[in-house]
Structures are given as C-alpha cells and as structure tokens.
Amino acid sequence: SRARYYVSFSYLRQEGMWNSKWTEYNDKFSTQHVLNRYNLRSNLDIDVNKYLNVSLDLGGRIDNISQPRTGVFSLVTFGAVEADPMAPVYTPNGELYSKSTAQNPARLLGSSGQDKNRRRNLYSTVNVTGDLSELVKGLKANVTVSFDAFDVFQSTQDNSVNSYEYDYMNMNVKDPSQFEYKQTTKYSALTNPSANERANYYNFNFNAGFSYNRSFGKHAVDARAFIRIRIWKTYATLTTMM
C-alpha cells in the first residue's frame, strides 16, 4: 500500500477523595480535585513514488486540572490528623464551627477557592526520505523537521464562608439558645480569576543530510553527512545550536 496511517484518541478523568458534601458546599463551583486529560496520537506514512517517502507523526495532550487552593497537607494535617476530636462541625444554630486552634475540614474545603491549571503538550515530526540510487547506487537523502511545544496556564480564585465559634465546654449553659457566638470567618463570593502563565517553551529541530550504504564484494561502506539545527526557546531566552 502507498499510504499507511494510525490514529488514537483517549480521555481520562480522575476525581479526588474529598467528601462532596463539602466540595459542593458553594453554589456554581466545586473545590474537588478533578483531572480531565485528552490525548491524541496520529501517524501518516506515504510512499509518494518509488523514490520518495513522506511520514508525519503528530501527538498532543491537554490536561485540565481543578483543585482547592488549600493544599492537601493542610486538609489532611489540620483538618484530620491534628483536628480537635471534641470540636463540633456545626454550631447549635446550624452554622459552621471553626476556631484558630481547631480547624474545621468542612470550612477548609468550603472556603478554599479554586486553583485551575491547563497544561498543553504538542509533538510533531515530519520526515522526508529520497532514494537517489538512480544517480548513485546506495545514496539516500533525508530531511527531518520536528516541533514540540509546552505551556501551563494557571488561574486562581478565592472565596470564604461564614463560620463561628462558641464555648461548647461551658457547663453553665442549660439550653443551646444560651450560647454566645463569635464570627471567625466572613462570607465572600468567588473572586475574579487571577491569571498566571507558569511555563511556556518550544523546541525546534531540523536535520538534513545524505546517507550512503553499499557493499563491494567482502567490503561495505556506510557513511552519513548531515547538518543539524536546534532552537529551544523559553519565554525570551533563545538558544541555537548547530
């Protein structure tokens, strides 16, 4: 056959382990860890004629990651491992309980905002091979061009929820309505996104030359002559090697 091809697409979704009761505490946004990954890979190989072959390799990946701004260490350490086992989740009047010395994991998740990251990878290679045996037996010409790119774009948003503390160890209180509350944190809506380009680079490679492979009786000759150009750019830093 003169043309051969291969195409592959895959999708992966992963979600975190946090209780959805608290990650979905706010309307219209979630503080759960979520990864959506898209992969594409394709190969195309064409025999243009008996002297010329062209191939293309193309691949790409996109990761969309959403996570709470409160880190896993804080959620696990202060929300679980070092949490006060006597501290309540709610106050008697139904509000979230929290105190500077007793972090409530429910409040930590509900007021952690959002940290979103988009990662993109692109891989591409074009290879052209010409058979010059009609001119010189065993001689071939080859050109290879590749381009790879990678970037990470981040957006962050903050929010807060209402939470209160009270002296739940006060033995003089006979009825829950007698407790006095002090507001610990105050509600604030999700802020506008704050953008940050965390990484951005590309890599360009060019390789061109000739190869010679021929046998003469008991002897063989295998030789190559080529030129290579590489350009690597990260933001404004440019490196060229030849």
Where do the language-model regions lie?
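Extracellular loop and loop/strand-boundary signature of outer-membrane beta-barrel proteins
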Residues: 24-30, 43, 109-115, 127, ...
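Outer-membrane beta-barrel translocator domains and adjoining extracellular loop/strand segments
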Residues: 18-24, 67-73, 154-160, 234-241
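Outer-membrane beta-barrel transmembrane domain signature of Gram-negative proteins
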Residues: 1, 83-99, 159, 163-242
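Flexible loop and strand-edge segments within Gram-negative outer membrane beta-barrel domains
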Residues: 2-10, 14-17, 31-103, 113-121, ...
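Membrane-embedded beta-strand positions of outer-membrane beta-barrel proteins
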Residues: 7, 56, 126, 141-143, ...
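Residues on the lipid-exposed face of transmembrane beta-strands in outer-membrane beta-barrel proteins
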Residues: 1, 42-46, 124-130, 208-212, ...
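Charge-patterned, long linear interaction tracts outside catalytic cores
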Residues: 125-146, 159
